Amino acid sequence: TEDGTGSGWAGATHYDWSRIDPSKLGARATQKARTSVHPMAIEPGRYTVVFEPTAVGNLVQFIAGALNARAADEGRSFFSLPGGKNKIGQKIVDERVTILSDPFDPDVAGSPFTGDGLPTQRVVWIENGVVKTLNYDRYWAQKNGRAPTASGGSIKMSGGTTSIDDMIKSTQRGLLVTRFWYLRPVDQRTILYTGLTRDGTFLIENGKITKPVKNLRFNDSPVFMLNNLEAMGIPERVSASEGGDPGQAIMVPPIKVRDFNFTSLSDAV
């Protein structure tokens, strides 16, 4: 904004240009900027949070990035178990969560082949909260007597039917988060990350957005987040990179979660 106290953002990405409405996105970003000026400071802590889809994509991509079978088998990841075992077959998140890759899905189409020349296929990583497979490259698959996992790199997460408006209406006190940036790993064994909210963070009181708030730093894991689900909306394709460029094909829903951990305030706009 002109006074330097507020900012807004909206974005969309799709292979079909008819699915993108630039005027609607521009109006949404402008509205967020105007309503985010002169934000108030709030106490850091654990909050109920309504995450817009882009914020969800910012975090869920780190679960997908941690699905490396070799790192799990060697004891270096969240998906590791003692004795060189891994978490395939274990429930790790809410049973409403399914995460898959499908290079032939028109909403999240990916490459027909991998970097090492394998034809890609539909791969279900997490189904009803349970780890179904990990990402095996050619070498690690051969070493373990398995077929390599050639997924094409896209991410699609299951959703629900609750709108963002209804998530807000059902929230006594919480926050609405548009998206994140400056996302950095803290502990890969728990997929713990830190980062900052940006471009529209708002206080929810008694089912209504009441005030803009200063941006906050979080320290939390998308795994913890997906274990604290209260509601999910309809998935949509998002620009999940920090810069807002299309990047990886990701389709995720808006979600409402409890007890998301914010640790400090930021003066960043």
Question: Predicted regions: what is each one?
Answer:
Residues 68-81, 145:
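Mature, solvent-exposed C-terminal subdomains and processed small-chain segments of exported/organellar
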Residues 11-16, 50, 70, 80, ...:
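Basic, gly/Ser/Thr/Pro-rich low-complexity segments located predominantly at protein N termini
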Residues 1-67:
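Internal alpha/beta scaffold segment
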Residues 12, 73-74, 108, 131:
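Alpha-helical structural elements
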Residues 55-59, 75, 239:
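Alpha-helix boundary/capping detector
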Residues 28-34, 67-74, 119, 189, ...:
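N-terminal processing/targeting junctions
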Residues 82-269:
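Dual-mode signal for accessory low-complexity, basic/Gly-rich regions
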